[in-house]
Amino acid sequence: MNVARLIVCALLALPVGWIAAVLVDRVPERRSLLVPRKPLRPSPRDLVVHLLVLVLFVAAAVRFADASLGTLGAFLVLFAALAALTVIDVEHYRLPDLIVLPTFLVSVPLVVVVSVVDDDPDRIRYALAGAALYFGFLFLAHLISPRGMGFGDVKLAAVMGLYVGWLGTDLQEALALVLWAMLLGFLSGTVVGLVLLVARRGSRPFPFGPFLALGTVLAVLFSEALVGV
């Protein structure tokens, strides 16, 4: 374990958590991000966002203890975005383009630059293949059932597939890990959906994005156990 990275990531989670909480509060209602927040007591939602960011950042520090700083930084970007989007989807049942698209536009050049700096340019190809696979699979699901699979989930899939595929040491491992991320996301979502159905709450809106995010996080953190990378 790299203790220095662990401490830095834990400290970094504080300002990033604050930024994520601002996004969660303002983006769904399209309020300006430039107006300072009033110094009010943190809401329970703010605390959830901060806790999610902290847990994910610490997990990233442990997972990427021996990776390059660029790789760690890139996954911190992903985890921060997933934390904010998860809370928004649970509360508003949507994944705003104002977070998803900038995350993708930042992530693609970030993946390219880090791969080149780390002298492993093949990873760029694996990342793009992962993004295409995840996006394509969910786009097909969206065409089959638009109400069951929203297009926000489809766009987020491109972001998640980019990062998950990036972890592969060859194309086969990259695609296998993306399939694992999808499987874990769909399984967790299906289980919770069945529980809600049994509890007679199945008629309520059901956000699927948080479960796709969970599957991605699990695939990233346990990639070695899943595909050996």
Predicted regions: what is each one?
Residues M1-V229:
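A membrane-topology feature that recognizes alpha-helical transmembrane segments
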